[in-house]
Amino acid sequence: MNEMTHRTKTRPVKVGNLTIGGNNELIIQSMTTTKTHDVEATVAEIKRLEEAGCQVVRVAVPDERAANAIADIKKQINIPLVADIHFDYRLALKAIEGGIDKVRINPGNIGRRHKVEAVVNAAKERGIPIRIGVNAGSLERHILEKYGYPTADGMVESALHHIKILEDLDFHDIIVSMKASDVNLAIEAYEKAARAFDYPLHLGITESGTLFAGTVKSAAGLGAILNKGIGNTLRISLSADPVEEVKVARELLKSFGLASNAATLISCPTCGRIEIDLISIANEVEEYISTLQVPIKVAVLGCAVNGPGEAREADIGIAGARGEGLLFRKGQVVRKVPEEIMVEELKKEIDVIAAEMAAEREKEKETQEQ
């Protein structure tokens, strides 16, 4: 069996101003729920996704109206835009003409060779990558006849079939996804894909469900895949506001130490010793730090005796008690604060540390560019 390609050894592929694959951080993606031809609504949703930390966004392009809207949408957003195309190569060409940053299309499904060539040539001319989207629920008939039902081997065979079509046209800016709604099937498919080729992998558990069930299912499946060193970009698919997809993705990547641009909350599970409303405080602080683009760790704890010591790794935190709380940095108490202003004081400290971290990052960036 071939050796598995670790995410850092995959081919780097440019998507707009980002690079997916190679020694680059995992990229968080989502997809809009609006009608793409409704430019105003689509842009508004993308803006909310940007604010939540989405780095690449995909839009459905089911018809010419949607394809014609791409150029207007592109002008008003700040993150790379992906066109989701099914079957009609002309829609892919229109999207590319409109300035799309990536096309999701399966070359084997869009007809004769001249149609595939037209899309590949247009993408090549503009430096636009193609994502091959293999889905267990829509495998080719000959593959289902061969294997009897969706299998990981069948999914990899499908991916290799589409990859070969592009490679035969000397096109190599390829990203591949191997999505299934069955968690075990998805894990096996991604692992076998990582052994079969070195193109970047887009991770996802498709049709995973509602906010609660889908979050659990996606975390179980994608967590196992990420832990194997597989995956260069991901989308959490939920039957929910797409902003929730981004939030879950950020938390998942943070859990594996794979996100350097997101804040982390540490909070205790509560017990009978607690004398403050810790749950509402933790939720308020979590919401406050949710859009920060720096790796600050914030602790909210309910026990002034054990709290600071239990969260030594936190950059800043509070340990509450009735009447007053302790404000601490890296496990060391900074000062006591009255309970009624405890959260506001914590927010002020968070702002200071986040600004320091952002300035430090800019300084490092300038040094690297010199």
Swiss-Prot record:
Chain sites annotated for binding [4Fe-4S] cluster: C268, C271, C303, E310
Protein name: 4-hydroxy-3-methylbut-2-en-1-yl diphosphate synthase (flavodoxin)
Enzyme Commission (EC) number: 1.17.7.3
Cofactor: [4Fe-4S] cluster
HAMAP family, A to Z: IspG
Metabolic or biological pathway: Isoprenoid biosynthesis; isopentenyl diphosphate biosynthesis via DXP pathway; isopentenyl diphosphate from 1-deoxy-D-xylulose 5-phosphate: step 5/6
Cofactor note (record): Binds 1 [4Fe-4S] cluster.
Keywords: 4Fe-4S, Iron, Iron-sulfur, Isoprene biosynthesis, Metal-binding, Oxidoreductase
Highest taxon listed in the record's lineage: Bacteria
Gene that produces this protein: ispG
Organism per entry: Bacillus thuringiensis (strain Al Hakam)
GO MF annotations in UniProt: 4 iron, 4 sulfur cluster binding; 4-hydroxy-3-methylbut-2-en-1-yl diphosphate synthase activity (ferredoxin); 4-hydroxy-3-methylbut-2-enyl-diphosphate synthase activity (flavodoxin); iron ion binding
One BP annotation, GO: isopentenyl diphosphate biosynthetic process, methylerythritol 4-phosphate pathway
